[in-house]
């Protein structure tokens, strides 16, 4: 039975690995996307006796899925409301139910509501200022951005982008759409002093070539685990035939 459980756990682990790789490849063109990586651990070891020696492994299981938060390459767009963070930081935006979530995607646009213009993400989330308020744009504003994240129109500052980071970014939880939310593990907001560049976006940090190489490796491992199950099934069939 041991080979059955080892093969079964191996297939599940490699499927989880391939799912993560597929997500990375499909999002390689997504602005600000951060590559996801899987880590695995051995399951419990067993011993055939109490004598000292190496135990017999029982398989592998998913240990964690973490993000590579290294910066992607800057892409020059020349678009006024495209912003790129150069360094460690996240834009704060308003998610569903008014909850604050965080993103590296600075592809912003204007939302016209009740006679006012608001700065929003491409998904429609309100971009927040340093006070946690929605950013309203002046009528007919020609927006300029300072390195410190201050938004100006006609030479006057009307808002400043809220830019934050975290003690443990790996502790952030994915909130969908390239956004993240705080957890106890990530810790609370810490003001970021990263530079923000206007007319520029951050590309994903996915290395597609490396991801395809990992996919091939995972597929081979998946196949080997499948052969383990086939071998176990054949041995079980032969054992049953001997009993009859």
Say what each PLM segment does.
Residues 1-244:
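Amphipathic alpha-helical polymerization modules
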């Amino acid at each position: 039975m041991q080979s059955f459980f080892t093969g079964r756990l191996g297939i599940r682990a490699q499927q989880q690995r391939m799912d993560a790789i597929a997500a990375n490849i499909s999002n390689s063109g997504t602005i600000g996307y951060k590559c996801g990586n899987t880590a695995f651990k051995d399951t419990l070891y067993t011993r055939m006796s109490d004598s000292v020696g190496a135990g017999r492994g029982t398989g592998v299981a998913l240990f964690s899925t973490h993000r590579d938060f290294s910066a992607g390459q800057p892409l020059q767009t020349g678009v006024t409301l495209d912003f790129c963070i150069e360094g460690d930081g996240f834009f704060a935006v308003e998610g569903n139910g008014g909850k604050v979530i965080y993103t590296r995607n600075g592809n912003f646009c204007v939302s016209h509501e009740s006679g006012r213009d608001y700065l929003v993400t491409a998904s429609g989330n309100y971009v927040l200022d340093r006070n946690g308020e929605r950013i309203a744009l002046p009528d007919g504003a020609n927006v300029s951005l300072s390195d410190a994240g201050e938004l100006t129109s006609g030479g006057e500052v009307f808002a400043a982008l809220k830019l934050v980071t975290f003690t443990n970014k790996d502790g952030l939880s994915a909130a969908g759409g390239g956004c993240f939310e705080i957890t106890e593990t990530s810790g609370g907001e810490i003001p970021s002093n990263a530079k923000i560049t206007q007319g520029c976006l951050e590309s994903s940090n996915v290395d597609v070539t490396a991801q395809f190489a990992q996919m091939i490796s995972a597929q081979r491992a998946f196949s080997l685990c499948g052969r383990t199950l086939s071998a176990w099934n054949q041995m079980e069939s032969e054992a049953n035939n001997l009993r009859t």
